Amino acid sequence: MIQVLLVIICLAVFPYQGSSIILESGNVNDFELVYPKKVTVLPTGAMNSAHPCCDPVTCKPKRGEHCISGPCCRNCKFLSPGTICKKAKGDDMNDYCTGISSDCPRNPWKD
C-alpha cells in the first residue's frame, strides 16, 4: 500500500515532461522507498515508433532481435555470413555480410 502511495506521489510531483522516468526502489529499515530517476530524453515520435525491430522506449533493437537497419539486417536479424551486401562493379569484388553485424564490411581481398 505504501509503495502505491509513494508512486502516486512521485508521479504527481515529477510529471512526465518529455523525458522518460524510471521508478527505482530500495529497502530502508523495512520500508520500501520509491523514487524517480530521470533518464535520456526520447526523440520526438519515439513512443509511437512503428518500426518492427525497434524498442520504442530505448530506440535499440527489441529483446531477441539483432538489428534495426543496415545492409546486412533483414527482418530484425543479421544476414548469414557470406551473403552479398554490395555487388562488385567493374574490376571490384563483392562485399559480404559477416553474420555478426548489420554493417557491410569492405572485402579484405580488394586492392
Swiss-Prot record:
Task: Recall the taxonomic lineage recorded for the source organism.
Answer: Eukaryota, Metazoa, Chordata, Craniata, Vertebrata
Q: Where is the signal peptide?
A: 1-20
Keywords in alphabetical order: Cell adhesion impairing toxin, Disulfide bond, Hemostasis impairing toxin, Platelet aggregation inhibiting toxin, Secreted, Signal, Toxin
Protein name per UniProt:
Disintegrin CV-11-alpha
Task: Say yes or no: keyword Signal present.
Answer: yes
Species whose genome carries this gene: Cerastes vipera (Sahara sand viper)
First-listed, main subcellular location of the protein, grouped into a coarse class: secreted
Protein family membership: Belongs to the disintegrin family. Dimeric disintegrin subfamily.
Q: Where found?
A: Secreted
SMART domains, alphabetically?
DISIN (SM00050)
| Cell attachment site, short sequence motif: residues | 89-91
The answer to whether UniProt assigns keyword Cell inner membrane to this entry is no
Residue ranges annotated for the Disintegrin domain, each copy included: 47-111
Function summary = Inhibits ADP-induced human platelet aggregation. Antagonist of alpha-IIb/beta-3 (ITGA2B/ITGB3).
Positions of disulphide bridges: C53-C76, C67-C73, C72-C97, C85-C104
Q: Which GO terms describe its molecular function?
A: toxin activity
Residue ranges the record assigns to the propeptide:
21-46
How does the annotation summarize its subunit structure?
Heterodimer with subunit beta; disulfide-linked.
GO CC annotation: what is one?
Answer: extracellular region
Q: Which PROSITE patterns does this entry report, sorted A to Z?
A: DISINTEGRIN_1, DISINTEGRIN_2
What does the entry state regarding organ or tissue expression? Expressed by the venom gland.
